[in-house]
């Protein structure tokens, strides 16, 4: 029996209930931070601040802009590679991100920014919320084309809450250093999403196989997303670092790692094709792996050549993953990873976590290696202990992501969320009104063309993200 995909009441009701809840909760718990409040002039006098330029807004807003572009444009366009799923990729990414940032401001605020039971909202909160939603976008890539917007909203709501708890445990309880989010953002999002898609395994997804391929223009749109992400990733990894050398170093390390991953992924893509041709899937994704891999160690004394090595390894491993690992995961482990997030976020995230742990463990007192003494820690932890804490943070994140993904997958598996049948997946027309091209004149509707119409465009590449 076919499932009912008509969302006329379910989607509007869920959206309105969630937004009304946000309004009430913001009214009860959220206020402006001192830097954003009208009392800023009093704060200046108390702190002997001579210029408004010392307001944190002017330090953080450029980074916030870049991260915002990555979340709403970069991730959205990156997922438009499917030939008949562009509306859903962009539109649903927009929807879940809009819900996610509001819920993240509350959840992260309750965990990190409360004062007298109130959340004081400033530019740092906005960056943190966008970073949280980036993890949601990562998980979305695993289930792209196979879930309804109602399921995505529920998944976003649950994941943001779990992300905030995990982030608090790692960054504030264990004091794990993770400037670019290799652990808290990429590993958490990837393995949460992979676990959800494993639970939601579709036995007859082959019936939608044709729509899982790309065409020329869909690959171009996806490449736009890649370029947005690639350009702004240094800001993403350095946005929340301390002012000065730490933030400067994070941008440099990310810049170098990204550049190295481009050359490596191009080389590997050509080598792995029997005719030496490049696969657009690899170029869209593996070229970004360096940004993921250097995330944890971004603000550490990794050294530029170390960042290049990380990018080199991540680009190669990511490309190999698309060729060999994605088919294996689907055929043997029943993990249908639409966007190949395991290759772009999962494995490079694991590499980044290991690099961070090793770099921390071999830090030096004068700060010429690692970061322990330059950054400082409570409880007088030495570099070896910090390295072990970094490793434990990785294991804890994997456990929380997989357990949470299992719970969420079982909830989403219920048959009344408006999900499509297997043969209808990866098709915009299930949830969007499709406006076909019509004649410009109403009188021309009976006119038949005197010349043959153009043939339907066929996919130019047989490569997909989930063979």
From Swiss-Prot:
Describe the processing and modification events after translation: N-glycosylated.
Q: Where is this region: Disordered?
A: 436-467
Task: Cite the record's Polar residues compositional bias ranges.
Answer: 458-467
Residues in compartment: Cytoplasmic: 1-9, 83-86, 201-219, 273-282, 326-343, 413-467
Report the glycosylation sites.
48
Membrane topology type: Multi-pass membrane protein
Q: Where is the composition biased (Basic and acidic residues)?
A: 436-447
Q: Where in the cell is it found?
A: Cell membrane; Apical cell membrane
Enumerate the UniProt keywords alphabetically.
Answer: Ammonia transport, Cell membrane, Glycoprotein, Membrane, Transmembrane, Transmembrane helix, Transport
**One Gene Ontology term, aspect cellular component:** apical plasma membrane
A GO molecular function held by the record: carbon dioxide transmembrane transporter activity
Superkingdom, natural source: Eukaryota
Q: Which reaction does it catalyse?
A: NH4(+)(in) = NH4(+)(out); methylamine(out) = methylamine(in); CO2(out) = CO2(in)
Kindly state the subunit structure of this protein: Homotrimer.
Record-stated family: Belongs to the ammonium transporter (TC 2.A.49) family. Rh subfamily.
Q: Please explain the role this protein plays, according to its UniProt record.
A: Ammonium transporter involved in the maintenance of acid-base homeostasis. Transports ammonium and its related derivative methylammonium across the plasma membrane of epithelial cells likely contributing to renal transepithelial ammonia transport and ammonia metabolism. Postulated to primarily mediate an electroneutral bidirectional transport of NH3 ammonia species according to a mechanism that implies interaction of an NH4(+) ion with acidic residues of the pore entry followed by dissociation of NH4(+) into NH3 and H(+).
- State the name under which the record lists this protein: Ammonium transporter Rh type C
* Source species of the chain: Oryctolagus cuniculus (Rabbit)
């Amino acid at each position: 029996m076919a499932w009912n995909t008509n969302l006329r009441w379910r989607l509007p009701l869920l959206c309105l209930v969630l937004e009304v809840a946000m309004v009430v909760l913001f009214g009860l718990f959220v206020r402006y931070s001192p830097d954003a409040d009208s009392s800023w002039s009093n704060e200046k006098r108390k702190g002997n601040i001579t210029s408004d330029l010392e307001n944190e807004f002017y330090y953080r807003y450029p980074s916030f802009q870049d991260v915002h572009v990555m979340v709403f444009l970069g991730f959205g366009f990156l997922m438009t590679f499917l030939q008949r799923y562009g509306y859903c990729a962009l539109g649903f990414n927009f929807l879940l991100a809009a819900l996610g940032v509001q819920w993240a401001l509350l959840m992260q605020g309750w965990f990190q920014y409360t004062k007298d039971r109130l959340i004081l909202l400033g530019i740092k909160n906005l960056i943190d919320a966008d970073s949280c939603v980036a993890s949601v976008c990562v998980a979305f890539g695993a289930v792209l084309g196979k879930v309804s917007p109602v399921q995505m909203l529920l998944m976003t709501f649950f994941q943001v809450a779990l992300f905030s708890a995990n982030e608090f445990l790692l960054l504030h309880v264990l004091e794990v250093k993770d400037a670019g989010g290799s652990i808290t953002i990429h590993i958490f999002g990837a393995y949460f999403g992979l676990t959800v898609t494993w639970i939601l395994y579709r036995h007859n997804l082959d019936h939608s196989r044709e729509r899982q391929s790309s065409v020329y223009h869909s690959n171009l749109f996806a490449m736009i997303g890649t370029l947005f992400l690639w350009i702004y990733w240094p800001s993403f990894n350095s946005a929340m670092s301390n002012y000065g050398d730490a933030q400067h170093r994070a941008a440099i390390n990310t810049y170098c790692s990204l550049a190295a991953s481009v050359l490596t992924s191009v080389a590997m893509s050509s080598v792995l094709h029997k005719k030496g041709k490049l696969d657009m899937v690899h170029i869209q994704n593996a070229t970004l792996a360096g940004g993921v891999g250097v995330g944890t160690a971004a603000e550490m004394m990794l050294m530029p050549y170390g960042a290049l090595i990380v990018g080199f390894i991540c680009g190669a491993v990511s490309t190999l993953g698309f060729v060999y690992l994605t088919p294996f995961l689907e055929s043997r482990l029943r993990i249908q990873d639409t966007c190949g997030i395991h290759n772009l976020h999962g494995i490079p995230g694991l590499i980044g976590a290991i690099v961070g742990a090793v770099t921390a463990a071999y830090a030096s007192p004068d700060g010429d290696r690692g970061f322990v003494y330059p950054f400082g820690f409570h409880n007088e932890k030495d570099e070896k202990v910090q390295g072990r804490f970094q490793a434990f943070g990785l294991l804890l994140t994997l456990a929380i992501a997989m357990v949470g993904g299992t719970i969420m997958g079982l909830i989403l598996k219920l048959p009344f969320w408006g999900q499509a049948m297997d043969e209808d997946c990866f098709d915009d027309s299930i949830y969007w009104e499709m406006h076909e091209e019509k004649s410009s004149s109403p009188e021309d509707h009976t006119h038949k063309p005197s010349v043959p119409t153009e043939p339907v465009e066929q996919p130019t590449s047989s490569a997909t993200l989930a063979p």
